[in-house]
Swiss-Prot record:
Species of origin: Phoneutria nigriventer
Compartments where found: Secreted
Chief place of localization: secreted
Entry remark concerning the domains of this protein: The presence of a 'disulfide through disulfide knot' structurally defines this protein as a knottin.
Expression by tissue: Expressed by the venom gland.
Disulfide-bond pairs as recorded: C64-C78, C71-C84, C75-C113, C77-C98, C86-C96
Family recorded in the similarity comment: Belongs to the neurotoxin 03 (Tx2) family. 04 subfamily.
Protein name according to UniProt: U2-ctenitoxin-Pn1b
Propeptide: 18-61, 115
Role played: Blocks voltage-gated sodium channels (Nav).
GO cellular component, one term: extracellular region
Lineage, top ranks: Eukaryota, Metazoa, Ecdysozoa, Arthropoda, Chelicerata
Annotated signal peptide: 1-17
């Protein structure tokens, strides 16, 4: 019984340390903790998933200089029930992104949409 408790404790510690490491990687960019929720835009999961996705590439290329109007004219959020708005990315550039309320629609949701 004691051996089972020890093994279970080791597994829990291993899982916790992995979660901590992932958290550190997420915030390893400079000034990541200083940014507000509205300034942070998630990136695509991988280059392979993005390579053929016109919708994602279109949104990444679209610059809007802080104005929502160009975004509303050029993107449709790939059928998601959201709105296309202009937001400051972690790169310090304004980009068109899709959001539902205060939640950014993740890039992987846009990956299935091709215009």
């Amino acid at each position: 019984m004691k051996v089972a408790v020890i093994i279970l404790s080791i597994l829990v510690l291993a899982a916790a340390s992995e979660s901590i490491e992932e958290y550190r990687e997420d915030f390893s960019r400079p000034n990541a903790m200083e940014r507000s929720a509205n300034d942070w835009i998630p990136t695509a999961p991988s280059a392979v998933e993005r390579s053929a996705d016109f919708a994602v590439e279109e949104l990444e290329r679209a610059t809007c200089a802080g104005q929502d109007k160009p975004c509303k004219e050029t993107c449709d959020c790939c059928g998601e029930r959201g709105e296309c708005v202009c937001a400051l990315s972690y790169e310090g550039k304004y980009r068109c992104i899709c959001r539902q309320g205060y939640v950014w629609i993740a890039w992987y949701k846009l990956a299935s949409c091709k215009k």
